[in-house]
Amino acid sequence: MKKALYLGAVAFGVVFSMASANEPNIDFNPPNYVEETPSKEFIPELNKLGSLFGQGERPLFADRRAMKPNDLITIVVSEKASANYSSSKDYKSASGGNSTPPRLTYNGLDERKKKEAEYLDDKNNYNFTKSSNNTNFKGGGSQKKSEDLEIVLSARIIKVLENGNYFIYGNKEVLVDGEKQILKVSGVIRPYDIERNNTIQSKFLADAKIEYTNLGHLSDSNKKKFAADAMETQMPY
């Protein structure tokens, strides 16, 4: 009994691990070139007393756009994806036929050789008929998909690269009625693409990684159960 329970637990673990391995995910670690590129050095500036353009916490006249590590920037995510794909295959093959060997005839006067020829001809007198074979295969499939993602979140400048570009990362979690929504965004942006109100469109993100996930009972009901998914994945037919 214990052995059966143990084997059942092992089988359950294997099925669960196979199903988990098929779940897509995104690695939000910075690209290699971001790690390899030196950070831009910032030289602190001393405040000038009596100046309207000081570098204090809240200067009277200053650019409100993010410029340094840990500054915040608002990302307007507007992504649309659509795909339309179809395929068809029609395969037919047929085979069949017969084979007749040559006949042996002796035209001489020697009776012994004549009988030998008749004997050999009788042994060789056959027809080979190949059975007919017909194969038909027809298959096809189509897929049409359209997705729109419109959302706004704030991100933080993680690193200012030596050329002045920013590597940013943002994370947003919302919990409503037991349904948790998680949005993660990372990428490299140019300061010139930041608008005056300190916002940037997601289309300007290089090496962009955008992940939108729903967690909860409602989301689970729209997903295939892991046991069924694992069995279909391993099914050879």
From Swiss-Prot:
Residues 87-111 are annotated as: Disordered. The keyword Aminoacyl-tRNA synthetase does not apply. It holds the Pfam family FlgH. GO terms for biological process: bacterial-type flagellum-dependent cell motility. One of its GO terms (molecular function) is cytoskeletal motor activity. Keywords: Bacterial flagellum, Cell outer membrane, Membrane, Signal. GO terms for cellular component: bacterial-type flagellum basal body, distal rod, L ring; cell outer membrane. Its main location: membrane. It is found in: Cell outer membrane; Bacterial flagellum basal body. Residues 1-21 form the signal peptide. InterPro entries: Flag_Lring. Assembles around the rod to form the L-ring and probably protects the motor/basal body from shearing forces during rotation. The basal body constitutes a major portion of the flagellar organelle and consists of four rings (L,P,S, and M) mounted on a central rod. Belongs to the FlgH family. This is Flagellar L-ring protein. It comes from Helicobacter pylori (strain J99 / ATCC 700824). The lineage of its organism: Bacteria, Pseudomonadati, Campylobacterota, Epsilonproteobacteria, Campylobacterales.
